[in-house]
């Protein structure tokens, strides 16, 4: 049976009133989870998982996957309206989404984000539909050196293509690495940066840190600036949506590049967060309007949202074909599959044909349903901007505190949130970028584990990162990204010298 025939069979299974109702419920719950800072898709799916034990596997996976898509969509809402990422992967969306909202373009930013998210997700689903066996064979070749090279590529891309001074970017990234190092060493078992405090044994909570750095830090800066949101700047109408859709086709190359980056990072897996940062950096580097990035450029919203959703969708590919989760949410879903008596791997496509293709079909329909539902809620969420900021600020602080408290149900997390908020405010005042810090905090421990495992495997030989064509190409790409500014300047100087020589010769 061909992929198309299998997909049509899956569509016939999913297109029932019961399953469509589960899609809408899952999307609505996911949007709520994505909007609330600190909760996130993995926690939301984990909380919902026990409720699926009495369902059939197809119904259960439809509910959980649609909650996942809704959370990815919802994470961009608070990122754009309040500069508070609902999801770690939505951090890059704040760079231009929030300035667009402040410039009175909240509707355009949200519409561009949601539409790009749908297109990115569909690319990921197409990859899963038609290239699953080939991608699974490719991902099977990855070991610790390849994983470290992928993370190194993410770090170097952000350093080499950042518009901030490289030294400040490195300092911010170093702080993030230090945050990621707190707790117990996973290799030796030694304690690092715990200062004899038991509550630091498990490390710093990323959710609490990002709520403080972005949420509280932004509130402090905004209060100092005396910002007041004006209602007329957040007017959302169907005409705004249609006008935004009319503009978006001109960014097809950004869409394509970001979708490919997202698929790559989802399958390898680098994750949606790294994919969104890399895509944003690449979009800024190659854009004709790069000077507008950070000031409210719609291309700066399109790139991270496309990559985020293509990576989030592609992350399910290694889970289904190899049993290797490509993201935290995929890991929770993997646990659900095991509980339901399913065993992910190459045989899953044969033994559980209806389940697999029902899931793939629900990915197509679920993302379309997500776009429709979230666009219908745009006026509701955008109307928040009409409320005076003196009223909104305490509400945001309260929501941040609830989100921080919900991570471990501990007041200590609320205190840490406030401390990270002060750090975020200080970094912003001194001109240090927060995004590299967040990237390093998210991927630092994973990169360290991959590096140390590579060193153990190779007896401490760095040549392991050039030991085969795959890891060598990844490492070479990382170094090229790191040295990109220098290479670009040298190439420009040589080009100008050549033009002068030609003029003199003439």
Question: Where do the model's predicted regions map?
Answer:
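Helix-loop-helix hairpins and the membrane-proximal interhelical loops
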Residues: 1-60, 133, 139-140, 191-297, ...
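Flexible loop linkers connecting adjacent transmembrane helices
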Residues: 47, 81-109, 134, 143, ...
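Membrane-interface alpha-helices at helix entry/exit sites of multi-pass transporters
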Residues: 58-62, 99-116, 288-301, 328-331, ...
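Re-entrant/interfacial helical elements at transmembrane boundaries that shape
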Residues: 41-51, 64, 79-99, 130, ...
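Membrane-embedded alpha-helical modules
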Residues: 111-227, 339-489
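Transmembrane alpha-helix interface/packing and boundary motifs in multi-pass membrane proteins
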Residues: 27-41, 70-83, 158-163, 260-271, ...
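A structural-propensity feature for long, helix-poor, extended segments
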Residues: 68-80, 86, 297-322, 326, ...
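Transmembrane helix-bundle signature of multi-pass membrane transporters/permeases
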Residues: 31, 47-50, 64-72, 113-118, ...
């Amino acid at each position: 049976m061909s992929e198309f025939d299998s997909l049509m069979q899956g569509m016939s299974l999913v297109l029932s009133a019961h399953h469509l109702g589960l899609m809408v419920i899952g999307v609505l719950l996911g949007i709520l989870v994505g909007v609330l800072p600190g909760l996130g898709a993995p926690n939301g799916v984990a909380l919902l998982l026990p409720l699926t034990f009495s369902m059939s596997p197809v119904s259960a996976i439809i509910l959980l996957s649609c909650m996942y898509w809704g959370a990815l969509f919802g994470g961009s809402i608070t990122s754009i309206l309040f500069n508070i990422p609902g999801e770690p992967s939505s951090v890059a969306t704040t760079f231009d989404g929030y300035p667009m909202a402040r410039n009175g373009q909240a509707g355009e930013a949200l519409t561009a984000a949601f539409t790009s998210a749908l297109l990115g997700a569909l690319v990921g689903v197409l990859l899963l539909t038609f290239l699953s066996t080939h991608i699974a064979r490719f991902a099977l070749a990855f070991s610790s050196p390849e994983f470290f090279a992928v993370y190194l590529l993410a770090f170097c891309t952000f350093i080499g293509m950042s518009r901030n001074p490289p030294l400040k970017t490195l300092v911010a990234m170093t702080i993030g690495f230090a945050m990621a190092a707190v707790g117990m060493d996973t290799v030796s078992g030694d304690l690092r940066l715990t200062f004899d405090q038991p509550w630091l044994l498990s490390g710093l909570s990323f959710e609490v840190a990002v709520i403080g750095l972005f949420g509280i830090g932004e509130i402090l800066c905004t209060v100092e600036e005396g910002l007041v949101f004006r209602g007329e700047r957040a007017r959302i109408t169907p005409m705004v949506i249609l006008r935004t859709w009319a503009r978006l086709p001109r960014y097809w190359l950004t869409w394509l590049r970001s979708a490919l980056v997202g698929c790559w990072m989802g399958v390898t897996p680098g994750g949606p967060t790294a994919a969104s940062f890399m895509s944003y950096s690449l979009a800024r580097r190659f854009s004709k309007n790069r000077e507008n990035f950070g000031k409210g450029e719609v291309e700066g919203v399109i790139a991270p949202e496309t990559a985020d959703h293509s990576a989030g969708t592609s992350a399910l590919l290694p889970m289904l074909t190899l049993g290797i989760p490509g993201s935290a949410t995929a890991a929770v879903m993997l646990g659900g599959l095991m509980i339901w008596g399913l065993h992910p791997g190459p045989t899953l496509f044969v033994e559980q044909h209806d389940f697999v293709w029902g899931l793939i079909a629900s990915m197509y329909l679920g993302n379309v349903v997500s776009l429709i539902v979230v666009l219908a809620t745009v006026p509701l969420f955008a109307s928040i901007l009409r409320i005076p900021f003196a009223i909104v600020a305490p509400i945001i602080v309260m929501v941040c505190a609830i989100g921080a408290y919900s991570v471990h149900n501990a007041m200590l997390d609320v205190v840490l949130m406030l401390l990270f908020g002060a750090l975020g405010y200080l970094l912003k005042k001194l001109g240090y970028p927060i995004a590299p810090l967040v990237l390093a905090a998210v991927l630092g421990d994973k990169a360290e584990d991959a590096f140390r495992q590579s060193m153990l495997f190779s007896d401490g030989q760095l040549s392991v990162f050039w030991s085969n064509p795959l890891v060598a190409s990844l490492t070479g790409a990382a170094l090229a990204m790191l040295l990109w500014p220098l290479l670009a300047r040298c190439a420009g100087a040589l080009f100008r010298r050549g033009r002068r020589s030609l003029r003199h010769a003439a």
